[in-house]
From Swiss-Prot:
GO cellular component: small ribosomal subunit
Domain S4 RNA-binding: 90-152
Keyword terms of this UniProt record: Ribonucleoprotein, Ribosomal protein, RNA-binding, rRNA-binding
Quaternary assembly: Part of the 30S ribosomal subunit. Contacts protein S5. The interaction surface between S4 and S5 is involved in control of translational fidelity.
One of the GO biological process terms: ribosomal small subunit biogenesis
Gene Ontology MF terms in the entry: rRNA binding; structural constituent of ribosome
InterPro entries: Ribosomal_uS4, Ribosomal_uS4_bac-type, Ribosomal_uS4_CS, Ribosomal_uS4_N, S4_RNA-bd, S4_RNA-bd_sf
UniProt gene name: rpsD
Function noted in UniProt: One of the primary rRNA binding proteins, it binds directly to 16S rRNA where it nucleates assembly of the body of the 30S subunit.
Keyword Coiled coil recorded: no
PANTHER family: 30S 40S RIBOSOMAL PROTEIN, SMALL RIBOSOMAL SUBUNIT PROTEIN US4M
Record carries keyword Ribosomal protein: yes
Full protein name: Small ribosomal subunit protein uS4
Amino acid sequence: MARMMGPRFKQSRRLGLNVCGHPKANKRMGKGLGRNDKKLTEYGMQLLEKQRLRAYYGVNEKQMHKYFEKALNNKEGLTTGDVMVRQLETRLDNLVLRASFASSIRQARQMVSHGLIRVNGKKVDIPSFQVAEGSVIELKEKSRSNELFKENYETNFAQSLPYIDKEENFKVTLTRLPERQEIPIEITDSLIVELYSR
């Protein structure tokens, strides 16, 4: 399992984004260690964007570099950055978060690792599992009465994305692969590509 070390609120302030899913983190992001406290060099900007993307998806450096290498060799006619972000977006743990089963990427990863998630009717307990277009993701039936999961799902049910179809019984479908502009992350991925291309 990928581990993002350090206090989550502090990391949110340093990176300028909510990496823990806690509403209080949004209030603290602008205090103390914000992104703009000092002028960054070009390398510093590239490094910060990479750290932010890693934090969004909760992946470690080794995983991140693998996604870059796969994207670099893509034959789809898309930019390396677009393919890299799309691969991250369609990880199972991230789609569990997008489905509103979980309130943070950490919680989503735990749910997958503990065997609570089904993909096309089969248990998948690998957070990095790459979900294919048309796949159905659902919460294990015995876990659907869990109050925390119910609150997550009911509170955020209306928040959807054009490539995800939600149903009311803890079931979602990845209807198609996402376009880069549809993925709701504030990242300049070209800076990350430049960093890894050095």
